[in-house]
């Protein structure tokens, strides 16, 4: 597979970053292949730069592990830091919050089933779409939204190839 880390894993973070922070203005990326037995990149990072000064960074490496008993929880870990607090999502599904000035993290409980791939995210996505088709429930995602994710994925690969920061043109 020519495109690996960003195509298989990073695209989900593109989606999450867009959901949480909106559309990036520019991006930069540095990708590399560490394992010579595969065709695509397996390590690297990309940064989304936002008009308001916010930065969102993905730093991934398919050769490293993270804290999870279930190795099918392959999405890694995430840390969000801001002026109103910090959120941490760990590889085992633990979600924590810390307010500014506090030293202790508070656990956020939420419904999470540690079964099948990625906490059963594929099943839940398929159920969501079937519910929309059968019951006319609203979709939380659209083809147009996902196509924008794929456009940003392509820009990430272009940025890594050209070693340049690229504009994320918005229609």
Task: Put a short name on every predicted segment.
Residues 59, 90-91, 109, 142, ...:
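Short linear motifs in exposed loops
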Residues 66, 107-117:
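C-terminal "lid/loop" region of Rossmann-like NAD(P)-dependent oxidoreductases
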Residues 8, 14-93, 123-135:
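Contiguous beta-strand/loop segments that form the cofactor/metal-binding neighborhood of enzyme cores
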Residues 56-58, 106, 139, 166:
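Short beta-strand segments
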Residues 39, 51, 128-171:
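C-terminal helix-rich "cap/oligomerization" subdomain common to oxidoreductases
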Residues 1-11:
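Conserved anion/nucleotide-ligand pocket segment
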Residues 78, 93-104:
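Short polybasic amphipathic segments
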Residues 114-126:
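Active-site loop of classical SDR/Rossmann-like NAD(P)-dependent oxidoreductases
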